[in-house]
Amino acid sequence: MVTMKDLLECGVHFGHQTRRWNPKMKKYIFGVRKNIHIIDLQKTLRYFRYTYNVVRDAAAEGKTVMFVGTKKQASETIKQYADTINAPYVNYRWLGGMLTNFSTIKKSIRKLEVIEEMEASGQIELLTKKEKLMLTRKKEKLEKYLGGVRHMKKAPDMLFVVDAAKEKIAVAEARRLGIPVVAPLDTNCDPDVVDFPIPGNDDAIRSIQLFCKEMAEAIQEGRALAGSEEGEATEEVTPASEAEKQEVLAEAMSEEGDALQESEVVEEEEK
């Protein structure tokens, strides 16, 4: 379990500039250094250990914890630790309705399965060069958005979120469904929207790695207590019908201009 030394070495105590704070975080702040809010690590340690136990107990009860973190410094770490414990994750972009309209998300996952079946059977090689290209592009896009949730059978029981302010849509959807949210809270966050807050730096890579590592270990420990080491089990994929294949192909061909449009959206977001 996390120690004070871990927190200090990973810079968990460094908050944002004082002008970028949320006054609701005042009780978690130790002081100010060079116009930077310093988080009270005594409180961080207490909240961290409590939340670790909450997540461990949830995993012991067979509950599913989804990892969410889409910003650059969190994306790879979220995937890395979620993959080690076979947990669902979102690390590229949160699609609206990912929780509240999960049935639609499942339909998109089905399209990914259909394309993969066409590849495995060699049927994709019988298509024109353009059709094959467009299907491949669609597969890559679906994998990017949904690869981390493709084996989920239902909405998760808990969310672990890195940067609750950035992932406000995910947090709002979870709250609407009564799904508890666990999150490190930087000094610019609103603690009222998180069920199990851990005051701490949610921007530094080492800090993010520490949070993800501890949550993954809590889940592993919980599963071990329950005598289960497995996460989301892969289910047998239903063979695709010819109608499904034609529908996915037609949709892929109609998205010819989407690749350019998406790159423009990403560029705009990064400005």
UniProtKB/Swiss-Prot annotation:
Keywords: Ribonucleoprotein, Ribosomal protein. Residues 223-271 are annotated as: Disordered. It holds the Pfam family Ribosomal_S2. GO terms for biological process: translation. Belongs to the universal ribosomal protein uS2 family. HAMAP family: Ribosomal_uS2_B. This is Small ribosomal subunit protein uS2.
